[in-house]
From Swiss-Prot:
It is found in: Cytoplasm. Keywords: Cytoplasm, NAD, Oxidoreductase, Pyridoxine biosynthesis. This is Erythronate-4-phosphate dehydrogenase. CDD domains: ErythrP_dh. InterPro entries: D-isomer_2_OHA_DH_cat_dom (IPR006139), D-isomer_DH_CS (IPR029753), D-isomer_DH_NAD-bd (IPR006140), Erythronate-4-P_DHase (IPR020921), Erythronate-4-P_DHase_dimer (IPR024531), NAD(P)-bd_dom_sf (IPR036291), PdxB_dimer_sf (IPR038251). Its EC number is 1.1.1.290. SUPFAM superfamilies: Formate/glycerate dehydrogenase catalytic domain-like, NAD(P)-binding Rossmann-fold domains. It catalyses: 4-phospho-D-erythronate + NAD(+) = (R)-3-hydroxy-2-oxo-4-phosphooxybutanoate + NADH + H(+). Pathway: Cofactor biosynthesis; pyridoxine 5'-phosphate biosynthesis; pyridoxine 5'-phosphate from D-erythrose 4-phosphate: step 2/5. NAD(+) binds at residues 147, 233, 258. It comes from Shewanella loihica (strain ATCC BAA-1088 / PV-4). It holds the Pfam family 2-Hacid_dh. Belongs to the D-isomer specific 2-hydroxyacid dehydrogenase family. PdxB subfamily.
Amino acid sequence: MKIVADENMPYVEALFADLGEVVMVDGRTLTQAQVKDADVLLVRSVTKVNKSLLDGCDRLSFVGSATIGMDHLDLDYLKQRGIFCTNAPGCNAVAVGEYAFNAMLELARRFHNPLKGKTVGIVGAGNTGTALQKCLEAYGVKTLLNDPLLEQSGDEREFVSLDELIERCDVISLHVPLTRDGEHPTHYLFDKRRLNALAEDTWLLNCCRGEVIDNRALIEVKQQRSDLKLVLDVWEGEPLPMPELVPLVEVATPHIAGYSLEGKARGTFMLYQALMAQLGRAVDKSLASLLPPLWSHQLSPLSVPDEKALLCLVRLVYDLRDDDELFRQRFQNNKGFDLMRKNHKHRREFSALMLANTAGSDVDWLLELGFSGVGL
C-alpha cells in the first residue's frame, strides 16, 4: 500500500508506516504524477482534490483530509469514482473551547470581575461551542445556548432565542459557521443593532469567523461603550484586520484559537482510525502515546481556592497573554497575520498537564475541566 500525505501533517509516519510505504509531499504543489500510484491520499485544506488531480489514479481508494471542512474536496467526483473520503470534524474543538474559557479567566483577572456567578451565552452549539460549555459547566458557570439549526434538528438540549440570550447573559461567545444564505444566515449576525443591545459590562468573544460581527459597527459601538470587553481571535478582512479596531480589543490573537498540538495531531489520528476501519483492522495506537509530555513531573494540587489560582494553573499550559502581545506588535506588518499563524508554536491543551491523586478530592472537578489525572 502506498500512502501519500501532506508534509505538514504531524505523526503520519508514526501512525501509517506499519501499513505501507509513506511518501510526504508539499500539499500546495501536489501533482497528478505524485498521486498516480497511491492507494491512500492524506491532505489538508491547501490541496484541491478533484478530477484534475486524480484522473488516471486508478489505485486510489481512500482520501482523508485532516480538516473540519470538506469544501476543498470534490465529493461528487469522489463518489462517482467510488473513492471513500473522510475528514476530521471537531479535531480542534477542545482547543477552541479552552481558548475561550482561558480568555474569560484573563478578563476576570484583569478587571477584577469574577467569571464565577456570571451567565455565559454560547451562540452556536456545535463541536466548539459544546467544548466551551463543558469547561464552563465543570467550573460551575451557568450557560445558555442559541442554535436554531440544531434546535430544529431535534437536539434535545434547551435553547433560547438570540435576543433572549443577549438580554440574559453577561458573557457571549460566538461559535457559528459563516453563512450568507438560508433561514439563519450568520454574516453580520452581530450588527450595530445587536451590538447596541448588549447589556452593560458584557464580554463578547468571537472564536469562529470575523464577519459574524460587523467590525466597522463594532468600532463605533466600542468607542462609545468602554464597558464592553472584547476578545477577538478572528477578524473581518483577514489577514488585514481594521487597524483602528485592534487597540479597542482586550484580547487579540491571529485566528489561532484552534491551534493546539493535540488538535493538530487529532486530525491525523482521526484519519488513521477511519482508514483502519475501512481496512477492517483494529486500532493499535493511541493519540496520547504520540504526544510529548508537557513536563517531566506532575502536580498534586490540594485546592484551587479562587479564580486567580485557577488562572495560574491554566497559564502553566498556555499563557494567552503571549499571543496577544505578539499580535499587537506584528499585525500591521506586511504578511504579519499569516506569518504569525504559520509560525505559531502550537500550544497544549489542558489534558497535557498531569494532576496526581485528584479523584475524589476537593479538586476532582479539574478532571471534568479537561486536565489529566494520574494515580486515580
